[in-house]
């Protein structure tokens, strides 16, 4: 009790002006709004449609146990040792083969580096490619943590709107022409083309190919983030942009977080060896190497065919939850509310009538027992207030229905004002 009291006193009345020791960049850092929101609802009776968490029921616990036992019996010396910065070679070989077979991407182990989740990959891309003032194109809306990772390196963000077919490349072309007239050029276009986070939409094949043409014409690189691509519940698959990349302009990001388990913190970058080499050097000073033990388990998971067998089970588990959310939205939402109808992934994006600020409305929703992520944080310029992201993978169908019902009641009350 005495220790708890002292800790509380230190928090309430700090003995130093700690702020003065932080760098200017550190002072500019802001906590993830989603992470802070999750703290708010994690211990309450609130139905949370806010997080981006995979359902624990989809974790292949039994398989992981068997693989872990085998790794400790046969590969302990490697698995428990430091590894190379570029990654565990057998895993990189297995990933290259998997991407060739799955996506028809001509790739080898020299094109792949493992990372501590794809979030680290985003930070490394910022370190290696972004100078202050560089123009980075992002989708509007886009992945909040990508904005956080890139913002640290002080780029200028340009937003391109999404529609039901993903990034509007016609508007992108207009913006590229406009910037060219001003003597400016884009360095990176960051996109989540398949089951986009937060919107859930998918870029069609025609737009993917056109984006590559624009990259060549205007000399920029594409960062293709694909954490959700395997989670397809309906519709026809679309190849990654990387599959048509003949010039080596696409830096592809993959992750095991949604197809194995996020706790392993294993992602990978697939790119031209020239890019990989510089990213590898940047990673050396960050964490020396990605968790070797996790990499060896991931290798066995891919090599043993468990990955391809497990993905359909994840899809079978999530599809009813996606369907339950779409059905509940149709049943309960008032006129004037619109939402996306994703063919896969983890999220639905809702747009409310103009004048409703979903960030201000959140407290009222939580009071009714439901949480969501306000959409403002997903825009680089934070200029859209009437949107929200809803997650359907973590909560059971019956709670999804009840959560949407509570949310609709909150929205109806706001619309009466």
From Swiss-Prot:
Q: What is the top-level taxon of the source organism?
A: Archaea
Q: Name one GO molecular function term.
A: aromatic-amino-acid transaminase activity
Q: Which CDD domains match?
A: AAT_like
Q: What class of enzyme is it?
A: transferase
Pfam families per record:
Aminotran_1_2
Cofactor field = pyridoxal 5'-phosphate
Summarizing the function annotation, the protein's role is: Catalyzes the transamination of phenylalanine, tyrosine and tryptophan. Shows virtually no activity towards aspartic acid, alanine, valine or isoleucine.
Q: How does it assemble?
A: Homodimer.
Full protein name: Aromatic-amino-acid aminotransferase 1
Protein species of origin:
Thermococcus litoralis (strain ATCC 51850 / DSM 5473 / JCM 8560 / NS-C)
């Amino acid at each position: 009790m005495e220790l708890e009291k002292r800790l509380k006193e230190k928090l309430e009345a700090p003995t130093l002006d700690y702020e003065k020791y932080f760098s200017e960049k550190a002072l500019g850092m802001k906590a993830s709004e989603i992470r802070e929101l999750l703290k708010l609802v994690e211990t309450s009776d609130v139905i949370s449609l806010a997080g981006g968490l995979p359902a624990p029921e989809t974790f292949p616990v039994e398989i992981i146990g068997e693989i872990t036992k085998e790794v400790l019996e046969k590969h302990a010396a490697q698995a428990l040792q430091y590894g190379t910065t570029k990654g565990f070679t057998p895993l990189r070989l297995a990933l290259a083969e998997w991407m060739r077979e799955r996506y028809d991407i001509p790739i080898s182990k020299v094109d792949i580096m493992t990372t501590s989740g794809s979030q680290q990959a985003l930070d490394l891309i910022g370190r290696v490619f972004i100078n202050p003032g560089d123009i980075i194109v992002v989708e509007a809306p886009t992945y909040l943590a990508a904005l956080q990772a890139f913002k640290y390196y002080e780029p200028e963000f340009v937003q391109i709107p999404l529609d039901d077919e993903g990034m509007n490349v016609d508007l992108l072309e207009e913006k590229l022409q406009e910037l060219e007239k001003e003597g400016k050029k884009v360095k990176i276009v960051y996109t989540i083309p398949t089951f986009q986070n937060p919107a859930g939409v998918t870029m069609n094949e025609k737009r993917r190919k056109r984006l590559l043409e624009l990259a060549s014409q205007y000399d920029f690189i594409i960062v293709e983030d694909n954490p959700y691509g395997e989670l397809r519940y309906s519709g026809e698959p679309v190849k990654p942009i990387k599959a048509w990349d003949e010039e080596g302009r696409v830096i592809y990001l993959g992750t095991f977080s949604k197809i194995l388990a996020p706790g392993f913190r294993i992602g990978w970058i697939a790119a031209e060896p020239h890019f990989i080499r510089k990213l590898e050097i940047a990673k050396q000073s960050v964490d020396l190497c990605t968790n070797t033990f996790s990499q060896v388990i991931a290798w066995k998971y891919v090599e043993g065919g468990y990955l391809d067998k497990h993905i359909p089970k994840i899809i079978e588990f999530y599809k009813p939850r996606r369907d339950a959310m779409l059905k509940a939205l149709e049943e309960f939402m008032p006129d004037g509310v619109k939402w996306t109808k994703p063919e896969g992934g983890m999220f639905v994006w809702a747009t409310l009538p103009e004048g409703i600020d979903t960030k201000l409305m959140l407290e009222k929703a939580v009071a009714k027992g439901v949480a969501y992520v306000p959409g403002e944080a997903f825009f680089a310029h934070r200029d859209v207030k009437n949107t929200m992201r809803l997650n359907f993978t973590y909560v059971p169908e019956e709670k999804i229905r009840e959560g949407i019902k509570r949310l609709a009641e909150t929205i109806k009350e706001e619309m009466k004002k």
